[in-house]
Each structure stands twice: as structure tokens, then as C-alpha cells.
Amino acid sequence: MAVHDFNSQRVFVEAGLAAGGRIDATREQANYLLNVLRLRGGDRILVFNGRDGEWLCTLETSGKRDLALVPAEQTREQTPPGAIRYLFAPLKRARLDYMVQKAVEMGVGRLSPVMTRHTVAERVNLDRMRANAIEAAEQCGILSLPEIDEPLALEKALAAWDAQVPLILCDEAAEVANPVAALERRLGPPDAGAPPREVGLLVGPEGGWSEGEMAAFDAAGCRRVRLGPRVLRTETAGLAAVAALQARWGDY
């Protein structure tokens, strides 16, 4: 059975979803559904909000622009958020868009921008990050949207980190070049017990970490992982590490 019906249109809403409810579509959603997709009253689409699962909703039109979504039946129950918290030095616009979309597709449960010594982007557009997360979830049948944190200075993020949660650091100078072997050395093999309920993944900027930051990682107990013999761009390194984590302890 497919994860979700790829033949049906799918949209995200902020409102609650329940039988007997009625959701007024935003102007943008109404324009997209009625004018771009050419749907009409009585047609059905899939709707989700990140909390109440996925619902098949009937379109109800009133006039040329007003549109309501009426939940008819739940097609899938809500899934829990992913266990990976992705901490990253912010990237410039297009590359950040790409990173967010792919991280959501791969099941990251929380996105946490951290400001480092060599961070390229000075500002982070959280609304744009959320829009990219929603678009990826809509297109890929995902039910749980990641939490998106306010940007935080790296030292504050480390100070607030729960010592019981493993924190993996992508480090091209780490001892073991095979990422899966490195992860098993740090977390144990997948058959050694239940996978971590949560794991942090820390990816740095293009300029790398400063000496002071590396010392702070050691003090915080970060577990270093090398992602093979090649130097990867920031967005590639993070996604490669997510793939390795998911393959060994994730929700595949």
C-alpha cells in the first residue's frame, strides 16, 4: 500500500480537523484550488495540519472566490515527529530552501538554526523556512511538520543541551571515515537496543568551526562523525548524516 494517495491534491491548513467541521480556505488556497487546479464544489482533496492526521475534505464554494473545506473522513492517523533534531549554521536563501525541504522529506523532527563564528547568513527568515517545510510535506505525503526554532548562538545552544540526548557533530577531521561505522561506535549497533528517542545532529558553516567552538564541542560531549573521504558542502553534509542516522536507527 502506498504511503499516501499521490493522485489526490493535498493542502496544509492551520485549523483543527474533525468530522462535522468546516474550514474557510485562505484567499491563496482558494485561488490555487479553484483557478490553478480547476477544482469545483463537490470535489475532494486531502488536508492535514500536523496534529490531527490526514482528512479527505469536500470543497464547498460560495460565489467566485469563497471556498470552504469540509472534513468527510480521516484517511491516516497522525504520525509522531521524527527523532532527529538538526542544528545547522544558516545558509543563504536558495541553499537554505533546499536544505529545509530535503530535511523535511527525510523525517527531521526539529530544525534549529545556530549562529557560529563563520556563519554566512546573518539573518534567518523563519516564515520562509516554514513555508518550505509545508510545501515539502504537502508534496511528499508527510503528516508531521518539524518544529522550527528561533536562531540561537552556538554557545547558548550547547549550554541548554540535554546531556542525556546524543549530539552528533559532523567533523571532517574525525577519526573514522565511514559514517555508519562512526555512528555505531558512538551510539552502538542497531541491534544493541532501542534507538535513541532523540538525537541531535550539528552541521557547521562553510568556513568550518573555530578552535574555540571545537573546544566547546569537546566540553559538551559531542560525538564526532566523519562523512567519508570527500569534503561536502554544508547542505550536503547534513543530509548525508541524516540519511546515515535514518538508515541505522530511523523510521525506514
Residue ranges: model-predicted function:
Residues 1-77, 127:
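N-terminal positively charged helical leader segments and presequences
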Residues 167-216, 222-226:
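Active-site/ligand-binding-proximal alpha/beta "capping" segment
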Residues 35-66, 155-188:
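N-terminal-biased segments
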Residues 69, 145-149, 224:
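Generic structural signal for residues in well-ordered beta-strands
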Residues 211-252:
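Structured adenosyl-cofactor binding patch, chiefly the S-adenosyl-L-methionine
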Residues 74-172:
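RNA substrate-binding interface of SAM-dependent RNA methyltransferases
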